[in-house]
């Protein structure tokens, strides 16, 4: 048996010693297509607090995901926002900014397999970081397959305003998309610049208007906003409120409090402005 602590692309704390193994090269789309199917109700085990590891059951799936199936199709993100964990992956390999994904047939087959094991599944959720960043031609292939073969609603929960286009939204809705979630984060150009987020306020507003055009065909879109940034001024907060006030209704807001992890670039940027970073235990 091989020592698990030698596994590439992982770090381990073993016997009070940090082991930093080499990183494997990023997989190509062809290699992603050649991966075996994801384990899903294939004799996995799950940890129950106070009980230890046990065989996973349908009840475990139901308590975690209800009647939905959660998946990720694309890997990578073209942005480099300092508040996001992707910034650390990009630090290790700049190619992580390139969007990589398996073929439309592969992701549809994955969903087929999940439904074959749990026929009661009634929705699919894509948790990609930049789903709309895929080329139109790939989305079109996916939509044709999904509409013809899967035939249950799906939601897209990782959308960057820069990549919101009417033609992409239209074909996704026709295939069964019923909800979308987009990251806005702030209505202040100053704070967006601080986060190293290149999406301009004008483009954010354009994206909300595009989504509003399709409000008859889907649930209200959800928009992410980050608060409790120690760098944010009263003027920055007011700019965010003004933007929210101007956005077309209806919509939902997901409000997040910024948690700064020590030794990250975000922490260094905040400390560079003379602001103390609380311990991660606080």
Regions found by a protein language model. Name each.
Residues 28-36, 41-45, 213-220, 247, ...:
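C-terminal accessory region of radical SAM enzymes
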Residues 23-25, 32, 82-83, 138-139, ...:
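Short aromatic-enriched loop/helix-cap "lid" or pocket-rim segments at secondary-structure transitions
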Residues 41-218, 227, 242:
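Radical SAM [4Fe-4S] cluster-binding motif and immediate context
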Residues 1-7, 173, 246, 277-282:
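Short, intrinsically disordered, charge-balanced linker/junction segments flanking boundaries
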Residues 156, 223-225, 255:
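Structural beta-sheet core signal
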């Amino acid at each position: 048996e091989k020592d698990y602590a030698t596994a590439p692309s992982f770090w381990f704390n073993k016997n009070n010693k940090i082991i930093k193994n080499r990183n494997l090269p990023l997989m190509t789309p062809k290699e992603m297509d050649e991966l075996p199917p994801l384990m899903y109700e294939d004799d996995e085990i799950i940890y129950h607090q106070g009980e230890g590891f046990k065989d996973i059951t349908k009840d475990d799936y139901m308590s975690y995901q209800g009647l939905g199936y959660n998946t990720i199709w694309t890997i990578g993100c073209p942005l480099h926002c300092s508040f996001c964990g992707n910034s650390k992956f990009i630090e290790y390999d700049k190619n992580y900014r390139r969007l990589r994904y398996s073929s439309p047939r592969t992701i549809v087959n994955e969903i087929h397999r999940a439904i074959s094991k749990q026929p009661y599944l009634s929705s699919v959720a894509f948790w990609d970081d930049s789903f709309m960043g895929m080329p139109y031609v790939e989305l079109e292939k996916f939509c044709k397959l999904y509409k013809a073969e899967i035939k249950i609603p799906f939601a897209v929960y990782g959308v960057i305003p820069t990549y919101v286009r009417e033609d992409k939204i239209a074909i996704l809705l026709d295939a069964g998309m019923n909800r979308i979630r987009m990251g806005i984060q702030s209505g202040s150009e100053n704070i967006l610049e601080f986060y190293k987020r290149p999406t301009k306020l004008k483009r954010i507003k354009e994206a909300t208007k595009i989504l509003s055009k399709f409000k008859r065909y889907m649930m209200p879109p959800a928009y992410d906003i980050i608060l409790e940034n120690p760098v944010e001024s009263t003027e920055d907060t007011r700019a965010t409120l003004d933007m929210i006030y101007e956005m077309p209704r209806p919509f939902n807001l997901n409000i997040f409090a910024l948690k700064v992890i020590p030794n990250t670039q975000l922490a260094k940027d905040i400390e560079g402005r003379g602001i103390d970073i609380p311990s991660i235990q606080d």
